[in-house]
Amino acid sequence: MSRRSLSLQFPLLLLLLLLPPPPVLLTDAGVPSPVNPCCYYPCQNQGVCVRFGLDHYQCDCTRTGYSGPNCTIPEIWTWLRSSLRPSPSFTHFLLTHGYWIWEFVNATFIREVLMRLVITVRSNLIPSPPTYNTAHDYISWESFSNVSYYTRILPSVPKDCPTPMGTKGKKQLPDIHLLAQRLLLRREFIPGPQGTNVLFAFFAQHFTHQFFKTSGKMGPGFTKALGHGVDLGHIYGDSLERQYHLRLFKDGKLKYQVLDGEVYPPSVEQASVLMRYPPGVPPEKQMAVGQEVFGLLPGLMLFSTIWLREHNRVCDLLKEEHPTWDDEQLFQTTRLILIGETIKIIIEEYVQHLSGYFLQLKFDPELLFRAQFQYRNRIALEFNHLYHWHPLMPDSFQVGSQEYSYEQFLFNTSMLVDYGVEALVDAFSRQRAGRIGGGRNFDYHVLHVAEDVIKESREMRLQSFNEYRKRFGLKPYTSFQEFTGEKEMAAELEELYGDIDALEFYPGLMLEKCQPNSLFGESMIEMGAPFSLKGLLGNPICSPEYWKPSTFGGDVGFNIVNTASLKKLVCLNTKTCPYVSFRVPDYPGDDGSVFVRPSTEL
């Protein structure tokens, strides 16, 4: 470059440096930035909101049965179905009244027709394959393939919304501890109106711990990427390594120990697996089972003991039928039989009790063989939150003449052996459990669980309770008084949330007015039933390829599944048969009459 060109450029550079900087165009402080239109939840009837630009959106109404800008114009067949379909409250009334009519229905083919209808209508409310997860509020391959996530029924509230619930309610959600103290904490024990007992509460807790496996390391939106359904991982362990530590490797059986002439789970000295016990509990006092936290409550270890005995009992029956089978085949086939027993008991006794229906529910996978049905399941975050039913827990635990406080009951490592299975089953079957819905029935020892669920739901940005009601085909509530059915709690909710459309998902489920003679409100039934039935009937053993006698070792194993009951589960594995039922005795509908006979196995 020449000296002349440099001399010409220098003044130009100097001039540029001395000039004032160009003006910066600032946004007018008086003009608010556009609100994400999807924060208003404009798309109805399961339409999908897609944002375009800053303040435009489009509703994808594909296969919703509706059209129009917001998916609100019904197609002719949709209109006809909606016009003819009875409301959930009317359907519930029909199913819980007219006992003698239902006695006739249960004895005819109509029962199977109605059962098929119940399963298909409920299951169709759950998307399959899964759609959303915590990280993806849109359809993605990750949402489908990555089983480390809980799936989501509704996407999260967009991050850029004016309020935590979208556009409704206050800028800040109420203090969690204040909310729990005012509306969830028990003033006095409110028993369940159906005669529900503490045995039911422990059965529910034991059962659900096989598929609610939140990852403590990854966070509340993640599972341990293991089973997403009824796999009995809480009995056999959720990894092959844990399973191998629990197995005897002889005749298909699980390890056990004999104490006072009775069979119990092995100690951690005999089965080297991690169990969560307080410091200072010696290894010989720690029982080793599939779920590491079951040492917390004697009721959970009670059912672990019963299922251990049942597994080894079934192994003996299969060994007699198939003397040539090796340990592995005996173990694997027995596991399938116990999965079948579990599903049968859950549908025909557990769900039956929860529903309060006079229609007798039936576990028959063949009902779906001609229907379009996917035999796979993914656990949803909403299902996990919904199932925190800690109001079932009483103020204390009554065993015989002794009353145990929570401090005496938790991590009580001697109670199960001291009393024995029969005495604990009998005691828990006779003690009333609490009402779940309606508010103010959490014992203060378990109130922190509710607070943790609400905290997690805020981290995961769950949509409002009313948005979930709409998703499951229910009409949204228009006021807190309509929601609670009374004035005092409604006024407190108005003060805390400011708008019924800002009420959170879990508080909504716990505070909703209960249906007549029911443990909880309409929403819990209408949201919980689809998750449950899809998860149970979506199990592989219910598929046409699996549901046949050969899968279960022939007619003997198949018959065990098809005739399973709570009473048989207990009484075939105890020396005498205690009172066993999900209802306290002398309550209408109780079927737990005692019959005493020796066990043939112990």
Curated annotation (Swiss-Prot):
GO biological process: cyclooxygenase pathway; learning; maintenance of blood-brain barrier; memory; negative regulation of epinephrine secretion; negative regulation of norepinephrine secretion; positive regulation of smooth muscle contraction; positive regulation of vasoconstriction
Main location: membrane
Membrane topology listed for this record: Peripheral membrane protein
Cofactor notes: Binds 1 heme b (iron(II)-protoporphyrin IX) group per subunit.
Named cofactor requirement(s): heme b
Pathway noted in the entry: Lipid metabolism; prostaglandin biosynthesis
Cysteines engaged in disulfide bonds, as pairs: C38-C49, C39-C161, C43-C59, C61-C71, C571-C577
Residues engaged in binding heme b: H390
Secretion signal span: 1-26
Record: glycosylation sites: N70, N106, N146, N412
Domain EGF-like: 34-72
Mechanisms controlling activity: The cyclooxygenase activity is inhibited by nonsteroidal anti-inflammatory drugs (NSAIDs) including ibuprofen, flurbiprofen, ketoprofen, naproxen, flurbiprofen, anirolac, fenclofenac and diclofenac.
A single cellular component GO annotation: photoreceptor outer segment
Note: The conversion of arachidonate to prostaglandin H2 is a 2 step reaction: a cyclooxygenase (COX) reaction which converts arachidonate to prostaglandin G2 (PGG2) and a peroxidase reaction in which PGG2 is reduced to prostaglandin H2 (PGH2). The cyclooxygenase reaction occurs in a hydrophobic channel in the core of the enzyme. The peroxidase reaction occurs at a heme-containing active site located near the protein surface. The nonsteroidal anti-inflammatory drugs (NSAIDs) binding site corresponds to the cyclooxygenase active site. Conversion of arachidonate to prostaglandin H2 is mediated by 2 different isozymes: the constitutive PTGS1 and the inducible PTGS2. PTGS1 is expressed constitutively and generally produces prostanoids acutely in response to hormonal stimuli to fine-tune physiological processes requiring instantaneous, continuous regulation (e.g. hemostasis). PTGS2 is inducible and typically produces prostanoids that mediate responses to physiological stresses such as infection and inflammation.
Family: Belongs to the prostaglandin G/H synthase family.
Subunit structure as annotated in this protein's UniProt entry: Homodimer.
Chain's role: Dual cyclooxygenase and peroxidase that plays an important role in the biosynthesis pathway of prostanoids, a class of C20 oxylipins mainly derived from arachidonate ((5Z,8Z,11Z,14Z)-eicosatetraenoate, AA, C20:4(n-6)), with a particular role in the inflammatory response. The cyclooxygenase activity oxygenates AA to the hydroperoxy endoperoxide prostaglandin G2 (PGG2), and the peroxidase activity reduces PGG2 to the hydroxy endoperoxide prostaglandin H2 (PGH2), the precursor of all 2-series prostaglandins and thromboxanes.
Protein name, entry field: Prostaglandin G/H synthase 1
